[in-house]
């Protein structure tokens, strides 16, 4: 039987410096109502095929990652569909600067509402269908991976599997 010294600790700290590559700060784990979670932000094409991914902590607002997500993809000449959370003026301005159009419905309390083609907006179900296909993979749905790099790698593998089906 192995016994520890009385002052020896089995601390949960990893001994890493703050901001280090493998520290808790960089693993995109945020505390929200459902517990510790990670959000997967995705861009899909017109057929619902995945194009680009981004991870954030679960307590981060979706719109704060939108410009970073869209900057990873060439969006010129395309129509960006998004829900009401992505209707911020800065996001709409970024999309217009890139030479793309947007179909994002305004919130009910917005001061200056803009036009939204709801017939085109119905195509937004493609991203929801993609996430339903992605959540079939239990490892993605429950995040078994400690490191964000490993989790994102498996999200990519699951996306490849979805594309091959």
Residue ranges and their predicted role:
Residues 93, 98-101, 109, 118-165:
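Basic, amphipathic alpha-helical segments enriched in Lys/Arg and hydrophobic/aromatic residues
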Residues 73-74, 117-119:
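Short hydrophobic "helix-edge" motifs at membrane interfaces and signal-peptide entry regions
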Residues 1-107, 158-159:
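Polybasic low-complexity intrinsically disordered regions
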Residues 64, 111-117:
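Short, charged, surface-exposed secondary-structure boundary motifs
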Residues 11-13, 113, 126:
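Mature extracytoplasmic/luminal segments of secretory-pathway proteins
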């Amino acid at each position: 039987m192995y016994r520890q010294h009385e002052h020896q600790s089995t601390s949960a700290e990893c001994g890493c410096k703050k901001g280090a590559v493998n520290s808790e700060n960089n693993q995109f784990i945020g505390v929200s109502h459902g517990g510790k979670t990670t959000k997967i932000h995705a861009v899909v094409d017109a057929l619902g095929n995945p194009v680009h991914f981004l991870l954030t902590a679960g307590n981060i607002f979706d719109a704060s990652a939108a410009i970073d997500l869209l900057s990873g993809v060439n969006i010129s000449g395309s129509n960006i569909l998004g829900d009401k959370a992505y209707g911020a003026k800065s996001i709409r301005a970024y999309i217009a600067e890139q030479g793309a159009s947007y179909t994002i419905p305004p919130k009910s309390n917005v001061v200056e509402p803009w036009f939204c083609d709801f017939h085109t907006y119905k195509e937004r179900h493609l991203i929801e269908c993609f996430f339903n296909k992605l959540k079939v993979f239990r490892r993605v749905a429950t995040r078994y991976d400690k490191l964000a790099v490993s989790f994102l790698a498996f999200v990519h593998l699951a996306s490849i599997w979805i594309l091959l089906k």
